[in-house]
Amino acid sequence: MLGKRTEILLISALMCGIIGYAGLGLAIAGTRIAAAEGTVNTVVSHQNTLNATFRSINIQLTALGTRSSFDAPQAIALVETSVANAELASRTVSHDDVSLRNADRGLHEHPWLTVVSNAAVDRATNRIRHARQALAIARSLAADQVQEGRFWQALYSGLGDLGELNRQKEAGNLPGARQALTRMGRDVEQAAALAGSTGLPAELAALTTDLHKLAADYTRQLDAEAAEHYDAAAAISVDVSADMSRIAGFDVDGIGSKVDAFFRPRIDRYNQEIEAATA
């Protein structure tokens, strides 16, 4: 009888242990899954802000849409805002990715404790995987947008210098014109160095080449005028006018379409991964 009672006590203790283990496992898994789900939801909540940032990639082009009323300071301010937003997006993505990595690590600590909730843990893991894939895409988009923005900053600065050059020359202020020309050369050089940035069409490199030629021809014209070689200056002005016409033929809409065609698939993939993370 004593042996039988001992067996019953041992079985009862074992059952209590199993029930306790299962209960503890469920509690631990529930806490970890809730933390992971909360982290994923935070990442998903940033989707609209990041999409707005990515949509501003082509906004940087709008300042050239009406070249007759081109406002260099306004255009540069627009680009600076876009770059600042992209840099903020990059920081947000990095912070979110660290949070997701920590949440994923937490889900899989001491896996023997969460065996009873493996299916739920796997679902949370899958959500984290999709969210991190979305962030990897977002990180590359933000980095590309920063580089592209720096190109537009340099280009718009160069175009602003060109406007100032024309104003100074028309006012007969040759020293002022030369100063503007020097700034233009520096800014165009910087734009040319960035023209190969990811997502920028080849036409933009050609545009910086045209601006280089314009700066060189303008320098020749100013030199001729300073030396009072007015016939030579008049002949060179024909080249300057041709340069201006070529630059004025810059196809803003066509460039915008190419930029959009390059970035749109990546933006779509980002949104698809976010949608998968919410499933």
Model-derived features with residue positions:
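Leu/Val/Ala/Ile-rich N-terminal alpha-helices, chiefly Sec-type signal peptides and the beginnings
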Residues: L2-L141, K258-A279
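C-terminal amphipathic alpha-helix
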Residues: V44-T66, V116-A279
